[in-house]
Amino acid sequence: MQPFVSFSQVGHTYHSEKQSVKVLDNVNFDVSKHEFVAIVGPSGCGKSTLLRVLSGLIEPSEGQVRVFGHPVSGPREDIGIVFQKPTLLPWKNVLDNVLFPLKHKFGHVSDKDRKHAQSLLEKVGLADFTTSMPNELSGGMQQRVGIARALLLNPDILIMDEPFSALDALTREEMGFELQRIWMEKPKTVLFITHSISEAVLLADKVLVMGPRPSTVLEEIQINLPRPRTINTLQEKTFSDYTTKIREYFYRPAVMETTASADKDNVAPLRRRA
């Protein structure tokens, strides 16, 4: 069966007047349709670059990325992106922020579009906040708006670049369970970057473990835990075994040495948080 997303020998180097920095080297992995894939690795190893390559925002220096067999050659409309910060427009209310991609693309929105946006806000638990302004919302609520906006055009692929990292621990955990519920109700192919190993194991079907720069995929770990995963899942031995296995990659001598070297080049090492 043809993979939905395929990275084949992907490498990327950033060039500047002072230096060239290779961040990705021979990255290979496949993603099935509707699979939830989490990506963990040291800071500065190129995780976000992977997602920019997939979304067509940058062209890889080496190799190729394909979506359902077709090479990625530029920005794609079938990919939704949720950033670390939701970047809401402060002068627009919640509903208009969700509708902004359609307004920007077509210049107008229909009553059908508004009903669709309202249904998405209901799905993320914000049905009563359509007329609220961003500054009236908590951080978690703002991120829910960002998720609804990313889903507006019904993308085949959802890219999430550390979407919960700016939230407090309790809100972050709540948002993880909320994301799982949304994904289970209407599955998407998800690539999710996180520095939290436990968050990766809790949410993903598969975790990609990346090494220090120039990074490649050290291992693909299938997460065989039943869904829906709950707060009780966090207490299970199998869950603990997965997090321990992943964490050990970042304490191996070779990885520690390379990561420390990267830190001297102003690249922060992995923030080792479970």
Which ranges hold each PLM region?
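ABC-type ATPase nucleotide-binding domains, specifically the catalytic core motifs of the NBD
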Residues: H15-E17, E59, K92, L99-K112, ...
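The feature captures the beta-strand-to-loop junction immediately N-terminal to the Walker
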Residues: V40-P42
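Helix-to-loop junction immediately C-terminal to a conserved catalytic motif
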Residues: S55
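Conserved ABC transporter NBD signature motif
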Residues: G63-P75
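Conserved ABC ATPase "signature" region
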Residues: S110-F129, R181
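Conserved signature/switch motifs of ABC ATPase nucleotide-binding domains
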Residues: S132-N135, L153
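Hydrophobic anchor residue at the start of the ABC signature
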Residues: I147
